[in-house]
Amino acid sequence: MSTTTRTLQAIKFDRNNIKLEILDQLLLPYSTTYIPITSIEDAFKAIKLMQVRGAPAIAIVGAFSVVVEVSNYLKQSDSNRKTIENLNDSLDYLITSRPTAVNLANALNDIKQLLQEFNDTDIINEKIYQQIYDYAIALYDEDLANNKKIGENGLKYIINTLTEQNFKGPFSIMTICNTGSLATSGHGTALGIIRSTYQALQKNNSKEEFWLDHIYPCETRPYNQGAKLTTYELDYEQIPFTLICDNMVSSLINTLSDDDNKKPIKTNQISPVKFIIVGADRIVENGDTANKIGTFQLSTIANFFNNNKFIQQQSKSNTTKTTINKEIKFIVAAPKTTIDLNTKTGDDIVIEERPANELTTLVGPLLNEAGDVGEKLTVGIATPGISVWNPAFDVTPHELIDSIVTEDPHVFTKDENGEFNLIK
């Protein structure tokens, strides 16, 4: 797939002309189309429709949309300008576009905090605009810098872990959803760690006795962010990967971990899965983590393999015990802005539920035999009128998480009581 660097730029903000565009991720990987965001209402719709997604990216788009809207206020006469109270109402409205992702609420609440020095009846002025502009720019710049730190810290954790395990040879990493440049200001969180690790631990340049051989992104039903977006980024970076369905995880890990009878998926793809790295939309005080639906399932599978040294495999003649890899680290990667210390446990996280048609239909372009892209079609795949449960996220209990990697050099791990200490 030929591409350019701007293809992976999910958010384009013109700092001089105060214009915001976002990459319409519903059209990827077949079309690269940017859409303008000219108001808070535009941002609400784009976030709700998932034209932009990923907790950090949502927060940045939300903040920049406020800048654009306030900039537009300043072009009006004083008598037509909105008040601080009007703006606060708009911020509350925008927060509801994606209630599970704490980054958006944090960013907009920060802006509301800036507004507290003004009276509700004050009209929007240049001073207010400048404060919001400075905040949004800092949010973007800090996110990009922090993502690179997350990548570096995750790489160090991986090297230390494999060294302590005395592991040698090739290994693989599994991930879910999309946590790369398309979900952030750039580089990414979980996918950022994968990028940094592959850059440092390729077979030909690794200074260690191990190297990153392969990535397994999960398809991530029902919205298919893994299939559409993560594969798009990995392909662009030329990082070796194989796409799998969400229900292939256990079988794949078992196949790659069978030291006595490894069955390669393809040539050179026999390295065991040593890490499952995921992003986060909200991490609460005890470490429980809300992330894309299917994340809890991955942590449960990793826990099973870590606690079962042998799996019974039935052959035609007898039953044999197969030794399996029992050291899969489950890593959550996210900026510290994703940590919500006001929520104690995952039971208190509000989980967004998506429309039923996202599960009962598939949407995509028609492809001819040559691979050329045609019109966008919606295809039914389920019995019409059936009951559907479609949560966008699930909550992974902290007990199933090995580490939380942020921009802080100190990687959060659990104490002797099995508890995280995330107090900043």
Swiss-Prot record:
Alphabetical UniProt keywords: Amino-acid biosynthesis, Cytoplasm, Isomerase, Methionine biosynthesis, Nucleus
Active site location: 281
Alphabetized GO MF terms: S-methyl-5-thioribose-1-phosphate isomerase activity
A single GO cellular-component term on record: cytoplasm
Pfam families in the cross-refs: IF-2B
SUPFAM superfamilies found in the cross-reference section: NagB/RpiA/CoA transferase-like (SSF100950)
Pathway the protein acts in: Amino-acid biosynthesis; L-methionine biosynthesis via salvage pathway; L-methionine from S-methyl-5-thio-alpha-D-ribose 1-phosphate: step 1/6
Annotated EC: 5.3.1.23
Keyword Chaperone: no
Primary enzyme class: isomerase
GO BP, sorted A to Z: L-methionine salvage from methylthioadenosine
InterPro entries: IF-2B-related, IF-M1Pi, IF_2B-like_C, Initiation_fac_2B_a/b/d, M1Pi_N, NagB/RpiA_transferase-like
Location of this chain's protein in the cell: Cytoplasm; Nucleus
Highest taxon of the lineage: Eukaryota
Cited Gene3D superfamilies: translation initiation factor eif-2b, domain 1 (1.20.120.420), Translation initiation factor eif-2b, domain 2 (3.40.50.10470)
Keyword field contains DNA damage: no
Catalyzed chemical reaction(s): 5-(methylsulfanyl)-alpha-D-ribose 1-phosphate = 5-(methylsulfanyl)-D-ribulose 1-phosphate
Annotated site location: Transition state stabilizer: 177
Its job: Catalyzes the interconversion of methylthioribose-1-phosphate (MTR-1-P) into methylthioribulose-1-phosphate (MTRu-1-P).
HAMAP family according to UniProt: Salvage_MtnA
UniProt family annotation: Belongs to the eIF-2B alpha/beta/delta subunits family. MtnA subfamily.
Protein name according to UniProt: Methylthioribose-1-phosphate isomerase
Source organism per UniProt: Candida dubliniensis (strain CD36 / ATCC MYA-646 / CBS 7987 / NCPF 3949 / NRRL Y-17841)
Lineage, broadest ranks: Eukaryota, Fungi, Dikarya, Ascomycota, Saccharomycotina
